[in-house]
Amino acid sequence: MRYSDFTQRIAGDGAAAWDIHYRALARVEQGEEILLLSVGDPDFDTPAPIVQAAIDSLLAGNTHYADVRGKRALRQRIAERHRRRSGQAVDAEQVVVLAGAQCALYAVVQCLLNPGDEVIVAEPMYVTYEAVFGACGARVVPVPVRSENGFRVQAEEVAALITPRTRAMALNSPHNPSGASLPRATWEALAELCMAHDLWMISDEVYSELLFDGEHVSPASLPGMADRTATLNSLSKSHAMTGWRVGWVVGPAALCAHLENLALCMLYGSPEFIQDAACTALEAPLPELEAMREAYRRRRDLVIECLADSPGLRPLRPDGGMFVMVDIRPTGLSAQAFADRLLDRHGVSVLAGEAFGPSAAGHIRLGLVLGAEPLREACRRIALCAAELLGQA
């Protein structure tokens, strides 16, 4: 049977990046002890008050269709959170609730870009980005960011890539996979480019609450940017709610109207009991949230400490997020070959940097998703793998 060209645009290297993770999961299911550091799924449970809110909502009979745009109570809380964190004044009409930030990104791209449009994206990039932009026929124009520069975008390099076909920039800070955050001066320079060339800014801020060093800057808060910025966020990482699929877009009211139309034919709204749980998540600070954030910071510091003096390895200290990139080029192997060897011989699953783009070649990404002792053991095995390759084990 014949399939649409669309199926080819959403396949490719990004989809294949998860193969090593699925191999590791298969071995876990067979009873092997594998240390899984290959995916950004928090090892924490969702805080109990959030879970209870969903249960209470279900018991109250909230199992019917909900507002396609998202419950007003939830959208108001999201608007308040965004206003508090960014300084940008927004209201509930500038918020659309969707099934996670991944869905939010897909919806925004469908509403902003046409076939043949160009979007400038920092590379390395999250593995689904290319497929998401390709789905609408847009062309990704990568701006390489290198480990030697801390994986940070340089505004002058972005400027050199702008053409008459450029329609948008898409950036995330803290960055996935590197955890690098952009300073205010860089955001201001990028904002000037957006205004000068009439571009959209798609700002993925999923890791903004896991920023340990520096200041989080939301580009929508900068002068002239509110009407040309779509801000994406979710509860997945900050609240350990990856499986709940709660995300949103904050943007101009006109964009939100288009997103609502797309949500109508794509989702028909998020489940009300999940939205009620999300309301509880955003109602008041939960002590579990700061505890999780502090745990990620300690884990980051632990990995840097454990690998800092390991021959053949150079861990790169992230500003935030839940990953650490490690330069393994001195071992002589490609990142994919190193990751395969690490899984096959040492029982540790990580992602190869090549999965995120050529600028991350020679690096591996490991998730801060295990407790201190398993993470320390994973670092020991990573160091041993490198030492074997250098003939020092």
From Swiss-Prot:
Residues the record lists as N6-(pyridoxal phosphate)lysine modifications: 237
Top enzyme class: transferase
GO MF term set: pyridoxal phosphate binding; transaminase activity
Family annotation (Gene3D superfamilies): Aspartate Aminotransferase, domain 1, Type I PLP-dependent aspartate aminotransferase-like (Major domain)
pH dependence: Optimum pH is 9.0.
Enzyme nomenclature, EC number: 2.6.1.84
Keywords assigned by UniProt, alphabetized: Aminotransferase, Arginine metabolism, Pyridoxal phosphate, Pyruvate, Transferase
A biological-process GO annotation: arginine catabolic process to succinate
Similarity-based family: Belongs to the class-I pyridoxal-phosphate-dependent aminotransferase family.
Function: Catalyzes the conversion of L-arginine into 2-ketoarginine via transamination. L-arginine is the best substrate, but it can also use L-lysine, L-methionine, L-leucine, ornithine and L-glutamine, which indicates that it may have a broader physiological function in amino acid catabolism.
Assembly and interaction partners: Homodimer.
Name listed for the protein in its UniProt record: Arginine--pyruvate transaminase AruH
Lineage per the UniProt record: Bacteria, Pseudomonadati, Pseudomonadota, Gammaproteobacteria, Pseudomonadales
